Every structure is written in C-alpha cells, then in structure tokens.
A protein has these predicted regions:
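Intrinsically disordered, low-complexity regions
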Residues: 1-174
C-alpha cells in the first residue's frame, strides 16, 4: 500500500530514528489504521504501524500493533513475520528502557537466527543499540562490528552508513 504522507526518518544524536515530519508521520499512521483490514496484508500493516508509532514516540500503541502482527504471523505459521516483529518489539522495549524484556526477546531471536540469515545484520544492529543504551559498550561494539561485516558483504550503502554511525558513536562514548 502506498502511504501518501512523508514517512521517512533520520537518526538523532542518540542513534534513534526521528521523523522527517512528525505531523505527516502521524497522518500516515492514521491512514494505515483506516485501511487496516483482516487479510493477507494485516500482519504487514500492523508491523508498519508498530514501527511508525515507535518512531513517533507512542510506545504503548507500538507494542499493541507489533503484538497484533506477531499473533497474526503465529496463526499463519509465518516464521519470518514472527521474527521481524519480535525484533521490532524488542526495539520498542529498548526505547522504553525495559531492558529485561528486550533482552529476553533478543535471546529468543538469537536461537532462530540461523533459520533467517537475511536478517542477521538487523538483529545485531538492534541488539547493539539496546546494549549501548544499557551501558554495555564493549558488547554493543562487537554487535555493531558483526552487523558491519554482514552489511559490507551485502553492499547496501545506506545500511553500512548507519552501522558506521553506531560504531563511531560507541567508540566516542565508552
């Protein structure tokens, strides 16, 4: 579905996503909710709403929609959908500074990571950011370095740049 609003974001000085336009992102979230229907796109739409709600700072709504996506993908036995949305939920717990909940999800996801190697770099990037905010700089740096190795192989410059930002931030704050 094409969202007719600016849903882009940048990263702030603490490596958190920040909407290019908060007002437009909120309009985009409302648009997604208006078009949310049970069906083949339900899980994907709930996941997107959960991500955008987190970026917009509405963490309770983020958790609600990510949990709805996880439930949907669990019912349809979609392992990839479950993994992606549990990773997103861990990210929301991280933003809430609920590190035990975030770490429990990261630990669970680590067990299924061998089945979903395409998401390994995203896993290590998000886990690294959580560990960084938790004050575990050495662990965070090792996760960012793992993410960077994978991303260099993939060759996606935007992802490589975001991981290098994380490494630079980590090195300057330890």
């Amino acid at each position: 579905m094409n969202i007719p609003f600016e849903m882009g974001y940048t990263f702030d000085e603490t490596l958190r996503e920040k909407p290019i336009s908060l007002a437009e992102m909120k309009q985009g979230i409302a648009f997604l909710k208006e078009h949310l229907h049970e069906g083949s796109l339900y899980g994907k739409s709930c996941g997107l709403i959960g991500v955008y709600e987190r970026i917009a700072g509405n963490l309770p709504e983020s958790k609600y929609y990510l949990q709805a996506a996880i439930e949907y993908y669990t019912q349809t036995d979609n392992i990839k959908g479950i993994f992606i949305n549990k990773l997103r939920l861990a990210h929301t717990y991280h933003w809430e500074r609920k590190f035990p909940a975030a770490n429990a999800l990261f630990t669970e996801l680590l067990q299924t990571l061998p089945d979903l190697p395409a998401y390994e770099d995203f896993f290590y990037q998000h886990y690294g950011k959580s560990k960084l905010d938790e004050g575990h700089f050495h662990t965070a740096l090792s996760y960012f370095q793992k993410a960077l190795q994978i991303r260099l192989q993939k060759g996606n410059e935007e992802l490589i740049h975001s991981t290098k930002l994380c490494i630079t931030y980590c090195m300057s704050h330890r």
